[in-house]
Amino acid sequence: MSYDKLNSFRIDGENEYDELCLKYGKARVDREIELELESKENAFNAFMSKRSKAIESGTLGNMGASRVLISEAIPVMTKALDKWFKEVDTGKPGKRHVMASLIRSLTSEEIAFIAIRTIIENSLGIVSLTKVSSAIGEAIEDELRFKMVVATMDKKELSRFNAGLDKRISMQFKKRYVENKEKILADEKRLKRWNKWGNANRVQIGLKLVDIFIVSTGLGALEKTVGDNKNVHYTFCLDTDVLTYLEHEDTETASLMFQNRPMVIPPKPWSNPFDGGYLINLKKPIQLVRMPSNECAQLYDEVDMPNVYKAVNAIQSTAWRINRRVLDVANEVCSWAHIPEALEMPSATPAEPPMRPAEADTNEEVQRDWRSAMVHYYQDDNKRKSKRYLVNGVLALANTYKDDMEIYFPHNLDFRGRVYPLTQLSPQGNDFTKALIEFAEGVPLGENGHTWLAFQGANCYGLDKKPFEERIAWVYSNTEMILSIARDPLQDLRWTETDSPWEFLAFCFEWADYLDKGNSYVSHLPIAFDGSCSGLQHFSAMLRDEVGGEAVNLMPDDHVHDIYGIVASKVTELLKKDYDNGTDDIMAKTEDGDDYLKKGTRSMATEWLKHGVTRKVTKRSTMTLCYGSSKFGFAEQVLEDTIYPALSKNPTAFSRPSQSARYMAGLIWEALQGVVVKAVEAMGWLQVASGLLAQDKDINGQSLPTYWVTPAGFPVKQNYNKVVLKQLRTFTTGTIRVKEPFKEDSQIEEGASINPVVYERTPEIDTRKQKQGIAPNYVHSMDASHLMLTVCSCVDKGIRSFAMIHDSYGAPAGHGDIMFTTVREVFVDTYSKNDVLQDLHDHIENLLSPKMVDKLPKIPSKGNLDLELVKESMYAFS
């Protein structure tokens, strides 16, 4: 290794390099340095390649530097347009009145946005003035035509139309979709077909907008040339400073890029908020906490948080390796033309598109149905491509590192203290990704490790709601199947029918080895102990809620309590009541005065009872309750998870999908109030307390954020500030965030230069966001604290390998007994030794002004849950 290369790394000279080489071997250290240099170079080249493609396709306006420039230029040109419109209104009638009348139904901001973006995307060299003017005129006309079409629609029709528009990727298909809708509306006599401007009008309007752009912003110029035949030609070009700025800023952005990949030596231990992880020096260094660097320094630089550093460093210093046997199967399956859907590995070959019926030539309805089918086909194929791209990326990484004896995943934290890997291939991936890796440092199974190995296999198969003994017995009674899969997984595909097929396959290989070698077998497979609806577990513990605690398995029992099933049963009881005594269907009116059938609770209950309410119907809503989900959110989840899939199989399953979703959401909400009373009370208290802080002011007149320190010692600051920005949306040029319009008394000189800036948040806190975010952020910080303290305790007990995912605690099977006990002990200690809600109450009480402090309610009363019972609960974390 050339010592010159070390200048790019956080390696303190030759001595530290030599120490690393002595510790890990020169070949590994040099490989890590080369991999990091390659990651930086690859990321730079990928960004610049993307920029080149954007220039070629005329979409540079989507790139970062261009968007900043456009955002800054919009208010300048907007003011100039307002001035021009006033001059038109007070001047003599003429050509400019005609131009103004054509475009006046757009706001000045919309016109400015369309014109500026079109100019930038069409003027990266010297271009014909006529060409760029025509492009602007065409974009303006398309926008006006779009607005004409949507103006005829009510809210319901507009919602469906926008959904259809979003499904079309390219502008070509979007425009065709609008034109088709226009034709339908015209046939229904709801509007007149658009009277096309013609190129002359487009060019005239474009010319005027180019002129206003040049005069107001000073970002472009015209050049006059006279040809041999004395014809005068005008060309337009952006100012060279603008072109230089765009290229420089995009190049700078590219230089900040880095491909986060696994390391082949342990990551640099975190010792402060800015020093840890990769060895390379980056212009934009990776921080311990994912937030703006100034805030990170302010909040964490001087904070003593030994448990935080100890936990993160233990997790990221876990040695992993590629599971070669799973990788070999994955490489083979990836080449199959038809891959089982459960494997989360889309085929490389697209499905056959719908055939166009011969009748489509003469039958407009058949043609429309075929086009609709093609839209769905392209949608599904785009999803396939996207998923395939991710799979290929993970596989490529696995194949790159398959020969390395050890690999490592650098980690850092979000602002709540949750631990995240920086890499795509990681222990926190999906089933497929997790199965591709295993602990490099194996642990002998010993006397009881085989039980935890069987426990893992049963869970991956889908038996995680069965009693513990039944899970273990199932593995032994199905040994023949497991061994058959391990011998030839490409022939015996029964593993593909399980809940977590890839992880089950990894288990099959491991179980076969155990049966061959016995308790002395050195196992490398991570065994996961998962929380049971973790957020509700934490709220139930902090408020000693025995009802909620029992529902989420904090109390010992001989069977697993399935809160999703409990809620489903209560919902079914409510449905039966509505079936017997519910309301009837009636005709009602929309806000727009249109008649519609409002389904009664009796008929909706009938449909739901016929469909059946299982734990799958209630799972996501129950799980997300303590993460801030509301009845409206529940309805969206029910539509997505249950109703739409049901309708795809039986179009008559739900006659009014949205009404049925809202109805079910209300029932789930009602059922939850009786199951997790204290959790609901805790969330309500948190929202009130956070809202009071946001509405109050400190001595400097600024709003107060919500701040707390977790039991692990990690400071959390929830601070959602208001931003003086607004989003401008157009059909032709998409969306952009711009500063609020200039006030009437603002002074903008024509030709004033524009200096793009990074927008800063205002000191004012957004009360609504503070209240919405506090419950999920608070409970996430608590599960993060539990994870950190569990890791610290396990390190003290000798565990060196961790597979941690927020509320899932993974360790080698040979250390299963230790992890099983520790995760419960730490949970109990956390809430026995810390009254976290009361501490937060007292902290907020000290911050609030006298007029606000009287509005702060006491924390919800506590129940009678004996936390010590959690240590005896088999299913609290299983």
Question: What are these regions, as identified by a protein language model?
Answer:
Residues 1-619, 628-777, 793, 797, ...:
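Non-catalytic nucleic-acid-binding interfaces of large nucleic-acid enzymes and RNP effectors
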Residues 417, 787, 807:
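Short, conserved catalytic/metal-binding motifs centered on acidic residues
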Residues 622-624, 640, 806-812:
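Conserved short loop/turn motifs at secondary-structure junctions
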Residues 773-782, 810-811:
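Short, contiguous acidic/charged loop-to-helix segments that flank catalytic cores in large enzymes
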Residues 780-784, 788-794:
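C-terminal substrate/ligand-recognition segments
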